Amino acid sequence: MQTLRFDNRFVDELPGDPDPRNQRRQVLGAAWSAVQPTPVTAPQLLAVAPDVAAMLGFSPEQTASPEFAAVFGGNALLEGMRPWAACYGGHQFGQWAGQLGDGRAISLGELVTTAGDRWELQLKGAGPTPYSRTADGRAVLRSSIREFLCSEAMHHLGVPTTRALSLVTTGDPVVRDVLYNGNPAPEPGAVVCRVAPSFVRFGNFEIFTARHDLTTLAQLVDFTIARDFPHIDGDVDARRAAWFREVCERTAHLMVHWMRVGFVHGVMNTDNMSILGLTIDYGPYGWLDNFDPQWTPNTTDAQGRRYRYAQQPAVAQWNLMRLADAIAPLFRDVTPLQAGLDHYGDVFLVAHEAMQAAKFGFVRQGPDEDALITEAFALMERVDIDFTRFFRALGDAPAALGDASAVTVLGDVFYDATLRDTHADALTAWLRRWHVAVGRQRPDAATRRTAMHAVNPWFVLRNYVAQQAIDAATAGDPSQVRLLLEVLRRPYDEQPEHAALVARRPEWARHKVGCSMLSCSS
């Protein structure tokens, strides 16, 4: 492992914190603070993502070694690593929250692979930093498993995301109050190694504008363009304008992907928005079970539902507006910023329409297809239909319906038998109209099935499935975590031997903590 090459441009090229103390404080005029991971008692590898390890240059023998667990548990460093925590702020639930920063995430370094790709390796749960505020800098096994699995699940679904290399248990208890209701309890501790080209967020830019530090703001903007958007050229004004436009475009495509797979992030604060258009910071996330566009998995958001499924594209645009506000002082004319925001809306509308058409098997979408799609979502919500299983069942619809009813064709997608029976005729009428319309565009049922199954996953990481793996791992059995890691690598392929993992949410999980609603406790 000592042959790995690190080139830590973030700390080499951006101003750092001159104060070496690892004490909670306001950090001014700096993009980062040097900080060492805090060692743990007994680092032990629980799981590793083999394709991420191979991408980074780690062999199976290396990932199985005690040295690997020590490094990625926070007890050792490799040559060339130069750990840091980043300074950023953010808008949380619509309100400016001031300095936030990496309170328990410590970046080890920027690894450059033999292919020339640059990957930042970041430990989450590696101990306190100057940005930890009142927290301990640690993470529990429960939330670490969720982040580890979801990072990889999203990648294999084709959704832009940070990756996860490893999950290491620490041997140390971490006290958390799961529901913030005054009942703290010790839980097993863990450290996840997250991997991305960059972990820079919208909030990294916001903090400097809020502090009127335009010098550091300009340095960060120009550094980000040079390192992470090297294809953008022109003079400084043109580069900055093109960069913001591309950030808007990437964010629009990210939102379309979330809507496609039924993913709800849960905490779309500006400090959780990647400048690269990646899904970042997996906390109280969830996938839709029954189709409910007003659903959010986050207990903190249960009343206002700011970050509900249907609202995510609008929130992303609001967050881009906050980013535009942050970088506006660098523009003599803010017209390019408004153009970028407009571009977000244009890109999202076109891509979202194409995505919806593809989910329903259409090659193109006109007024008739529009009406069918709108009616389908209304029925799915009214009848309490499982989002993921509905689209897979639709893809499996036979070439000829004959006299088959929607209940027969759709099968086990219903959560409420009474609602199913009440609306059976309406569902069948819709199904027949859809079958005629899609048949005009894709007359061959096998071709249609292949196309629909390519965009509608068979497997998504449902909260209740993840929670079962968490419960087992907490009791000392990591086999379910490792099984899920294998299954999620082929989310569009039917894996009959693992059919239990794609069952619609069981009734016992409807209101169970960790299965339906989650807090930010981690």
Swiss-Prot record:
Q: Where does ATP bind?
A: 101, 103-104, 124, 136-137, 194, 201, 281
- Keyword Metal-binding on entry: yes
Q: Which UniProt keywords apply?
A: ATP-binding, Magnesium, Manganese, Metal-binding, Nucleotide-binding, Nucleotidyltransferase, Transferase
Q: Which cofactor does it need?
A: Mg(2+); Mn(2+)
Q: Where does Mg(2+) bind?
A: 272, 281
- InterPro entries given in the database record: SelO
Q: Where is the active site?
A: 271
| Pfam families reported in the protein's UniProt record | SelO
- Reactions accelerated catalytically: L-seryl-[protein] + ATP = 3-O-(5'-adenylyl)-L-seryl-[protein] + diphosphate; L-threonyl-[protein] + ATP = 3-O-(5'-adenylyl)-L-threonyl-[protein] + diphosphate; L-tyrosyl-[protein] + ATP = O-(5'-adenylyl)-L-tyrosyl-[protein] + diphosphate; L-histidyl-[protein] + UTP = N(tele)-(5'-uridylyl)-L-histidyl-[protein] + diphosphate
Provide the E.C. number(s) assigned to this enzyme: 2.7.7.-, 2.7.7.108
According to the UniProt entry, its GO molecular function terms are: AMPylase activity; ATP binding; magnesium ion binding
Q: What does this protein do?
A: Nucleotidyltransferase involved in the post-translational modification of proteins. It can catalyze the addition of adenosine monophosphate (AMP) or uridine monophosphate (UMP) to a protein, resulting in modifications known as AMPylation and UMPylation.
Stated family: Belongs to the SELO family.
Q: What protein is this chain from?
A: Protein nucleotidyltransferase YdiU
Q: Which gene encodes it?
A: ydiU
